[in-house]
Amino acid sequence: MDRFPDVSNVVLLTVDSLRADAVGAYDERRHTPVMDSLAADGTVFDRAFATGNWTPFSFPTMLSARPVFADTNRIGITESRALASVLSEAGIATAGFNAANGFLTSHWGYDAGFQEFEPFVASVGSSIYSRYLATHPTVEAWVQFATSPLRRAGSWLRRNTDDRPFLDTSRMFDVEHAATSFLEAADAPFFLWVHYMDAHTPYVPAPRYIREVSSNFFGTHRMLHAHLRTGLGWDVDERTLNELRTLYAAAVRQVDASIGRLREALEANGLAEETAIILAGDHGEEFQEHGHLAHYPKLYD
């Protein structure tokens, strides 16, 4: 059997803010068993570079082969030929599910060509609010993060230990369920795009994944403390920086587990052998290697 047999389908998995060295295939100290198994069975690119250090600067190239600001001063792909459009016109089924990144919505043209498209960005019926969400893509995540102590307390009172309240904050289950439903009904050939936000600040991983990557106890108060200091621009000491790294690693492992469930869905529907899986990050994440946290809009090299 060929190592790389002919495939009919493509699943593109993009993870917001995914550092290469957060994956075990690039750094053996990391705990990402599912991603590592993909790497072991496939091709690993050691010198692949994002075309930007921010979602609106990198995704135009990924989904429309257009460098941002190439011919206009705009972000998004409303004036570009989208990959999904080309595939759809060729008779390939297309679906895209984005875990609430406001920069990857129809407002910016990312629905083009997708027969099924869901950005999972909440709408409250206000055009002003909708425009605000489109340019502040993580505001919902910060609201969810601020209420995380209440969710943890509620889970404790209900003796609920499945961590679902934390997993819900990233819309991970929403995109996972949508993708699984698409796979159950899909007729080959198809193109499926899934975008995860778990590794984007604020990092709110479920406690089970914190325990997988760290032996240190990590309560909600420490999670709040670490993000509060960074959010307010205060000095971050080494302890807080290490806590942020731990939360980030746990969030990446959370995505890793979700990818594993999608692979199981491919297997269950008899699609695994004829489906290519592509895994990529849209940009990295900084932990003061160059003086900032998260992904500050700057170039250092």
Please describe what each predicted stretch is.
Residues 1-301:
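Catalytic domains that recognize anionic headgroups
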